[in-house]
């Protein structure tokens, strides 16, 4: 049987975090507990991963979330490469893990795997729920500093969040929409998974500002489509048939292509505002199918998140602000 941090913790009757602190020679472990854990490590023949068993190299883990659109995966990896070119390679190394789903169980499995490797910092984009918050708490107790990007968990023990000002992004989208339609018109709002704070807050900003601009509280329909083409297509087609005064669609997340296909051939004028300048959004913006793109620096979020941990762990530079916002910009057809 190959022993892991989890099995050592079970045998010693302590948490995984305690085992990690012992393995990494960190404080806050009583002499008795440290001796017991070290004895079990010796008895079981447990070996820490050879890549991180010696020297003073600090390992930072990056968990790449699973997206339907590879644009976001590629943008995340681009941010990792940007950071890799700037970090002090003699002091810091990066370990990247890609997810195959958005299941909480996979997040936890990858966190455990990276903890096993001895990471001192972790960058991740995850849903805002108690399961992930509890995992971040365990990582914190193990001495691992966590920085979130894109979607925050503000009530967790993460040390910092790097992302778009989501409320502002939604408000910008509402302002653009209000310039294209009448307050008497209906708006369809398509979002992904409301468990992700990035999806939830952006929609809140959009709807709140629409009401401030004179639109009624009942002017919209909301569809949670999990960034799936089929669900988005059906939601748009259904809204077109049910709401004769539907003249605006806000795509708070993907799939923009499904929205474009659903409104193809529609006789009425349709204003479409989307987030993120994906290849599909760029093509549809050029064609005039969509009107505005509210863009965020996705690669920059990952880059900055890694660099926050780099500065903290390699040089002891404390995090000054709990939230760092990247720039938000508006893209029109004329800018392409």
Language-model region placement:
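Hinge/beta->alpha junction and helix N-cap segments in small-molecule ligand-binding domains
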Residues: 65-71, 95-106, 128, 162-172, ...
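Hydrophobic alpha-helical
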Residues: 121-138, 206, 224-281
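Conserved beta-strand elements of the Class I
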Residues: 61, 186-190, 247
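Hinge/cleft segment of the Venus flytrap/periplasmic-binding protein
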Residues: 210, 297-336
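N-terminal helix-turn-helix DNA-binding module of bacterial transcription factors
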Residues: 1-56
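Amphipathic helical "hinge" segments at domain boundaries
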Residues: 48-109
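Flexible loop/hinge segments that line or gate small-molecule binding clefts
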Residues: 129-168, 278-290
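Short helix-capping segments at alpha-helix termini
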Residues: 86-90, 142, 210-217, 242-244, ...
């Amino acid at each position: 049987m190959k022993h892991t941090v989890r099995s050592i913790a079970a045998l010693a009757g302590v948490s995984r975090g305690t085992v990690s602190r012992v393995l990494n020679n960190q404080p806050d472990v009583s002499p008795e507990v440290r001796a017991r854990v070290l004895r079990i490590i010796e008895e079981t023949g447990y070996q820490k991963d050879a890549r991180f068993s010696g020297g003073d190299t600090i390992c930072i883990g990056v968990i790449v979330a699973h997206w339907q659109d590879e644009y976001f995966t590629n943008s995340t990896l681009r941010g990792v490469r940007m950071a890799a070119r700037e970090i002090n390679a003699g002091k810091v190394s990066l370990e990247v893990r890609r997810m195959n789903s958005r299941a909480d169980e996979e997040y936890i499995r990858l966190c455990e795997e990276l903890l096993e490797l001895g990471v001192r910092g972790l960058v991740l984009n995850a849903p805002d729920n108690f399961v992930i918050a509890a995992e971040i708490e365990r990582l914190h107790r193990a001495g691992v500093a966590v920085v979130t990007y894109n979607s925050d968990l503000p009530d967790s023990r993460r040390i910092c969040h790097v992302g778009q000002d989501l409320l502002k992004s939604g408000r910008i989208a509402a302002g653009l929409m209000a310039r294209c339609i009448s307050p008497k018109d209906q708006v369809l709002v398509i979002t992904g998974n409301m468990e992700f704070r990035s999806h939830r807050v952006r929609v809140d900003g959009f709807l709140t500002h629409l009401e401030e601009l004179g639109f009624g509280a009942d002017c919209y329909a909301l569809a949670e489509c999990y960034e799936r083409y089929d669900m988005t297509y059906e939601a748009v087609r259904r809204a077109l048939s049910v709401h004769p005064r539907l003249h605006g669609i806000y795509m708070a997340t993907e799939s923009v292509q499904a929205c474009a296909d659903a409104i193809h051939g529609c006789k009425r004028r349709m204003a479409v505002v989307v987030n993120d300048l994906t290849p599909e959004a760029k093509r549809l913006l050029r064609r005039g199918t969509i009107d505005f793109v509210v863009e965020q620096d996705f690669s920059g979020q990952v880059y900055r998140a890694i660099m926050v941990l780099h500065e903290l762990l390699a040089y002891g530079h404390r995090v000054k602000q709990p939230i760092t916002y990247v720039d938000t910009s508006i893209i029109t057809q004329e800018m392409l």
